Amino acid sequence: MTNIRKTHPLLKIVSTSFVDLPTPSSLSSWWNFGSLLGVCLVVQILTGLFLAMHYTSDTATAFNSVTHICRDVNYGWILRYLHANGASMFFICLYLHVGRGLYYGSYSYLETWNIGMLLLFAIMATAFMGYVLPWGQMSFWGATVITNLLSAIPYIGTELVQWIWGGFSVDKATLTRFFAFHFLLPFIISALVMVHLLFLHETGSNNPTGIPSNPDMIPFHPYYTIKDILGFLIMLTVLSLLVLFSPDLLGDPDNYIPANPLTTPPHIKPEWYFLFAYAILRSIPNKLGGVLALVLSILILAIVPMLHTSKQRSMMFRPMSQCLFWLLVAYLLALTWIGGQPVEHPYILIGQMASVLYFLMILVLMPLTSIMENLLLKW
């Protein structure tokens, strides 16, 4: 009798994707983050769904509804903090996943990489809109400052901002539409994830060596299912520790003050996972220039495949490129730190230097180093 798993139309898709999928035998723990992102997405959708049952998207009651969830709803506090800190875990996994792709040359799979970039932008948009919903001081002023950046677009900027706001300032209309989009986008993200996996399974996974591993494949189950489950346990343990012991560690205390359009917080800043881009934005004195640098800091990932000049795919056997890669990581960490500091000396200068080095590294130094490595290896 034939196994139903291999004949049933629906089960066959699941089977070829998660059971019988031929997978390189040399995948390291850096390949765990894709499945961890899937777990994060499920956690966010489930906790978000239950939070939406009690949340009201009205400026008069939004802040109080979040307080009500934490105080009066059964296990509402754990849902709220799982959702807030789950977003942080999401971005940690996301940045590690992208970093893995850059290090091991996974961007050679252009369709998978481009869908991944769409996913990155969609997740960033979702997280930004979610941060506005509790309607605290940082929610309100963060929304005002970030949406106002669109006014830098020549000719249509001001009209565009007012169209997004639904009025002349961030108000009830803005909050309602942000809630609607924050609820909708995760389902669009889920669809994009399926397309991402579809393209990945067309080519098969990359591996740490960057060398085709067709002669040495193993089935996904049981080898990588067990490995992924270990990853889930580690991530969920870290998330649980964060939620149960220091739930406000990554948040901003100003968000416990109800939104007040009449008083500005001393230092407006986004959540920690956007600080690197915020630092790049602030390091350019011109408004339009800053907005362009902000967008390009993430959009630069789209041209990374074109800047690949090495004859090798992965950085595993390229020590000079490895040094530059870890310097790039250091610049990103420096930018994250600077984004959380006030705009004063010496932070301004450090931010400007780190911003220039970030772009210089990706656009000039890494491609040149790859060419030099080719020459050293007489390729």
UniProtKB/Swiss-Prot annotation:
Heme b b562 binds at residues 83, 182. Keywords: Electron transport, Heme, Iron, Membrane, Metal-binding, Mitochondrion, Mitochondrion inner membrane, Respiratory chain, Transmembrane, Transmembrane helix, Transport, Ubiquinone. The keyword NAD does not apply. Coiled coil: none annotated. Its cofactor is heme b. It holds the Pfam family Cytochrom_B_C. One of its GO terms (cellular component) is mitochondrial inner membrane. The keyword Transmembrane helix applies. Binds 2 heme b groups non-covalently. The chain crosses the membrane at residues 33-53, 77-98, 113-133, 178-198, 226-246, 288-308, 320-340, 347-367. It comes from the Eukaryota. GO terms for biological process: mitochondrial electron transport, ubiquinol to cytochrome c. Heme b b566 binds at residues 97, 196. The cytochrome bc1 complex contains 11 subunits: 3 respiratory subunits (MT-CYB, CYC1 and UQCRFS1), 2 core proteins (UQCRC1 and UQCRC2) and 6 low-molecular weight proteins (UQCRH/QCR6, UQCRB/QCR7, UQCRQ/QCR8, UQCR10/QCR9, UQCR11/QCR10 and a cleavage product of UQCRFS1). This cytochrome bc1 complex then forms a dimer. Component of the ubiquinol-cytochrome c reductase complex (complex III or cytochrome b-c1 complex) that is part of the mitochondrial respiratory chain. The b-c1 complex mediates electron transfer from ubiquinol to cytochrome c. Contributes to the generation of a proton gradient across the mitochondrial membrane that is then used for ATP synthesis. PANTHER family: CYTOCHROME B. This is Cytochrome b.
